[in-house]
Amino acid sequence: MAKAIVLLSALCILALANFAHCRPEVFDVEGKVYCDTCRVQFETKLSENLEGATVKLQCRNISTEAETFSVEGVTDKDGKYKLTVNGDHENDICEVTVVKSPREDCKESVSGYEKARIECSDNVGIHNAVRFANPLFFMKAESVQGCKEALDELGLFPLEF
């Protein structure tokens, strides 16, 4: 009888431990938005962080394409944003999109580069509640002075500046 009580107690404790380990699925998505001053579609030493840029995270069901989650945010003085995603979105495609630039001189977006895809599920092999999105950007209408030199330092040779 004593063995049965010990066994039952151990099972109850394990069940409670498993319950205590449960946590709501909440993810933080962090990223950055910058102004591409050289119009090369990647960051250079002349790129400028964009404070006040609006970004939107949107999750859509893979099969139906119905929106399952959406949240907007604004970048800080360093061009960084942090968005909170509630729930597991294993069956969704989640993307962060640049929505609006705070600067009139740097507001051009490039089709195909205005989004960063992220995984918002515990079931993808990532054991961290923070997800990092690729940097997003807006471009100036014209390249600024010094771009040729900045690209030369990187070993890149621009075709036209």
Swiss-Prot record:
TM annotation in the entry: none
A GO term from the CC aspect: extracellular space
InterPro entries: Allergen_Ole_e_I_CS, Pollen_Ole_e1_allergen
Pfam family, one: Pollen_Ole_e_1
Signal peptide (from-to): 1-17
Summary of the tissues where the protein is detected: Expressed in anthers and pollen.
Alphabetically ordered keywords of this record: Disulfide bond, Glycoprotein, Signal
Cysteine pairings via disulfide bonds: C35-C106, C38-C147, C59-C94
Annotated glycosylation sites: N61
Function comment: May play a role during germination or early tube growth.
Family: Belongs to the Ole e I family.
Stated name of the protein: Anther-specific protein LAT52
Source organism per UniProt: Solanum lycopersicum
Gene: LAT52
